[in-house]
Amino acid sequence: MSPKVTITHLSDLTPPSQERTWLTAPHPTLPLVATCSSDKTIRVYSLTNFTLLSTITGGHKRSVRTAAWKPHMTGESVLATGSFDATVGIWRRWDSYGQEGDAGMGMSSGDKQIPTDISTAASNGTGTDTADREEDEEEWRFAVLLDGHDSEVKSVSWSASGMLLATCSRDKSIWIWEDLDDGDNNFETVAVMQEHGGDVKCVSWHPSEECLASGSYDDTIRLWREDLDDWGQVACIKGHGGTVWFLDWEGEETEGNWSGPVADSVSESALSALQAQWRSQRALSGPRLLSCSDDRTVRVWRRQPKESQQTGPLSSATTGIPSIIRPTGTDEVWEEDAVLPRAHELPVYAVAWSKRTGLVASTGADGRIALYEERFVTREQEQEQQADSDAMDTTSGDVLRTEWVLVGVQDGAHGIYEINHVAWAKRADRRPGGEEEVLVSTADDGSVKVWTLTR
């Protein structure tokens, strides 16, 4: 069996918030993270030196619960934030303000660190015009307030294209907003879905399709798509025995460096062949969905390929001709692909699926961080696996069999405090050793910690 993964504390993000922190969102391209705090602020930290760069204030009247960076932005960063005050804020900031290289957004240029706290006037220019311009360009601009929810906003998520923003709330609703991208920060409400029977805890967009997943206090996961200009539910997954706290998607094949599951005692060429076959089979279903719950489990879900649902005499599977009108309607069948090894004694609040390594991280109320790895099950291992309590295999029928193995655990990662969120981020401190990625955990005591992984 492959060596276990050691989780090592690299640094805290300093200074921490003095109140509970809920979530830390890594920037998609820059070495930055945005941390949501109960003190009504969003704190932007550098992953280069682990220090505070900006404190975004003044937009929300209650705790900031969630945040997400808009993808595919050039020269400007856009951050969506959701608050217990029932509103969603959109913030903008130029990535560079007259500096070259990676000095923008507070990144160091040589040994010089550029101050970026919006509460401090940065007027270091030689003239008044220059100072005013730099101060204006440095600051986060509160672009627009999206108002529609009746209660606390729990999660926000941008679609892969960056044109759609999904928000969900304690009011049991999911809203989808379209960024009109007209230069005036205008957003249009395109859908309001209210099928959930309880507080909607999380929303997460498919990595390439306009398909939205949501998890709720009603113990279900629901999938949503647009059909003929109307958004509607296409699947309802009833597998968890408690509140679904968080969702994350598996990465696309083009993302990161992950080739697929690993295998023990197999040559590189044999492993490559297995991975190629596995990717070919997986392409029929698309990326899988990861969930965690109050029932203390972490689960993986797989969409049943449309071909297997379309078995009628005129289906594309029998005629070879793609059908524009789907004979089975818009409904999708999602099935449980795996239940990961039980690693938590209390509710699991967050999961994160690495797009670079394929590792899964989970955390929650027990203050523990757990790591899981997916591995191929060889013929020689199948008999042994039946009695292996540390591994749980997928139920994927005719496809290559895999198992998820618990490979790393960090107990008491934030002392006695509950951990609310965990995320993968690209390592940026440029120090040798360790993996290319770090884990970022966010806890009740206001601390945010960065962890490295070694085998």
Swiss-Prot record:
Lineage, top ranks: Eukaryota, Fungi, Dikarya, Ascomycota, Pezizomycotina
Organism this protein belongs to: Penicillium rubens (strain ATCC 28089 / DSM 1075 / NRRL 1951 / Wisconsin 54-1255) (Penicillium chrysogenum)
Protein's recorded name: Probable cytosolic iron-sulfur protein assembly protein 1
Keyword Methyltransferase among UniProt keywords: no
Domain of life, per lineage: Eukaryota
Any Pfam family hit: WD40
Alphabetized Gene3D superfamilies for the sequence: YVTN repeat-like/Quinoprotein amine dehydrogenase (2.130.10.10)
Function: Essential component of the cytosolic iron-sulfur (Fe/S) protein assembly machinery. Required for the maturation of extramitochondrial Fe/S proteins.
Homology family: Belongs to the WD repeat CIA1 family.
